[in-house]
């Protein structure tokens, strides 16, 4: 059974709506996103080899958990960071964190779930942080605040950054001044390559060479600051328009 058919039946929605949810990576099967053509029946058969599942019906079995991203997280960004942390075994517990570009709070939500000691949330916008996060005493919110003018008497054990419509290279100096050790940056090529690079109608970049050059320039800029690159990998979730994005995990020396 195809994943799109499974989603339409399980959620009692049209096939087109199911496809829309899947293409936007807004529906998860057992915590992960899959393509519309993914074989759910085969997936279930493999689960049965290691788990005692009941009942047998593919649409009723408790072995297949279907979740809508909007019902779990305040934004898609949350799942991006969650997957990256889990895949790299990065420990957040008891760390004083700074989140740059907090927006609705996707990264903030995951830092909280991972028991961060305190989170300073920074954003140039206003009234964006989700209501469920605004009242949390661990969060110190700075709205209408540009990183380049932000002042802090303390430095942060972990800095996360997810920004749009600006190149990360323009922020590295300011991040370096605030960082004690760990830095996790979401690199978005669509905001790094310049305006004249080929894109499709949705805004998805179509120039691999330009993307590679932008990444190399970014990595060189980080290296000049003395940062040690621990890992870089594609985000498990693409940008809203479908652009591939990349996580970078650095240690400040």
Curated annotation (Swiss-Prot):
<dbReference type="Pfam" id="PF01728">
    <property type="entry name" value="FtsJ"/>
</dbReference>
<dbReference type="InterPro" id="IPR036986">
    <property type="entry name" value="S4_RNA-bd_sf"/>
</dbReference>
<comment type="function">
    <text>Catalyzes the 2'-O-methylation at nucleotide C1920 in 23S rRNA. Enhances motility. Enhances biofilm formation. Involved in the assembly of 70S ribosomes. Involved in virulence by promoting adherence and invasion to host cells. Involved in pathogenicity by modulating secretion of host-protective chemokine interleukin 8 (IL-8). Involved in susceptibility to antibiotic capreomycin.</text>
</comment>
<keyword id="KW-0489">Methyltransferase</keyword>
<keyword id="KW-0843">Virulence</keyword>
<dbReference type="GO" id="GO:0048870">
    <property type="term" value="P:cell motility"/>
</dbReference>
<keyword id="KW-0694">RNA-binding</keyword>
<comment type="similarity">
    <text>Belongs to the TlyA family.</text>
</comment>
<dbReference type="InterPro" id="IPR047048">
    <property type="entry name" value="TlyA"/>
</dbReference>
<keyword id="KW-0698">rRNA processing</keyword>
<keyword id="KW-0949">S-adenosyl-L-methionine</keyword>
<protein>
    <recommendedName>
        <fullName>23S rRNA (cytidine-2'-O)-methyltransferase TlyA</fullName>
        <ecNumber>2.1.1.226</ecNumber>
    </recommendedName>
</protein>
<dbReference type="GO" id="GO:0071236">
    <property type="term" value="P:cellular response to antibiotic"/>
</dbReference>
<dbReference type="GO" id="GO:0016032">
    <property type="term" value="P:viral process"/>
</dbReference>
<dbReference type="GO" id="GO:0008649">
    <property type="term" value="F:rRNA methyltransferase activity"/>
</dbReference>
<dbReference type="GO" id="GO:0003723">
    <property type="term" value="F:RNA binding"/>
</dbReference>
<keyword id="KW-0808">Transferase</keyword>
<feature type="domain" description="S4 RNA-binding">
    <location>
        <begin position="1"/>
        <end position="73"/>
    </location>
</feature>
<dbReference type="InterPro" id="IPR002877">
    <property type="entry name" value="RNA_MeTrfase_FtsJ_dom"/>
</dbReference>
<dbReference type="GO" id="GO:0042256">
    <property type="term" value="P:cytosolic ribosome assembly"/>
</dbReference>
<dbReference type="InterPro" id="IPR029063">
    <property type="entry name" value="SAM-dependent_MTases_sf"/>
</dbReference>
<dbReference type="GO" id="GO:0000451">
    <property type="term" value="P:rRNA 2'-O-methylation"/>
</dbReference>
């Amino acid at each position: 059974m195809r994943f799109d058919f499974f989603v339409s039946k399980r959620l009692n929605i049209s096939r087109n709506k199911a496809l829309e949810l899947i293409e936007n990576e807004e529906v998860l099967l057992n915590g992960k996103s899959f393509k519309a053509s993914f074989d759910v029946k085969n997936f279930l058969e493999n689960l049965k080899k290691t788990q005692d599942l009941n009942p047998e019906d593919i649409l009723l079995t408790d072995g297949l958990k279907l979740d809508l991203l909007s019902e779990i997280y305040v934004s898609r960004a949350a799942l991006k960071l969650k997957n990256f942390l889990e895949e790299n075994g990065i420990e957040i517990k008891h760390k004083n964190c700074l989140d740059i570009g907090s927006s609705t709070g996707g990264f903030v939500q995951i830092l909280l779930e991972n028991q961060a000691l305190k989170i300073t949330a920074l954003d140039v916008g206003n009234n964006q942080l989700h209501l469920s996060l605004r009242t949390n005493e661990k969060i110190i919110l700075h709205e209408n605040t540009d990183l380049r003018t932000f002042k802090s008497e303390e430095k942060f054990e972990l800095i996360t950054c997810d920004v749009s419509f600006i190149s990360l290279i323009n922020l590295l100096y300011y991040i370096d001044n605030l960082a004690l050790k760990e830095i996790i940056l979401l690199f978005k090529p669509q905001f790094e390559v310049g305006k004249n690079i080929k894109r499709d109608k949705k805004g998805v970049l179509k120039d691999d060479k330009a993307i590679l050059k932008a990444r190399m320039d970014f990595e060189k800029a980080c290296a000049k600051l003395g940062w040690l690159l621990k890992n870089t990998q594609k985000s498990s979730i693409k940008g809203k328009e479908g652009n591939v994005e990349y996580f970078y995990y650095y240690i400040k020396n």
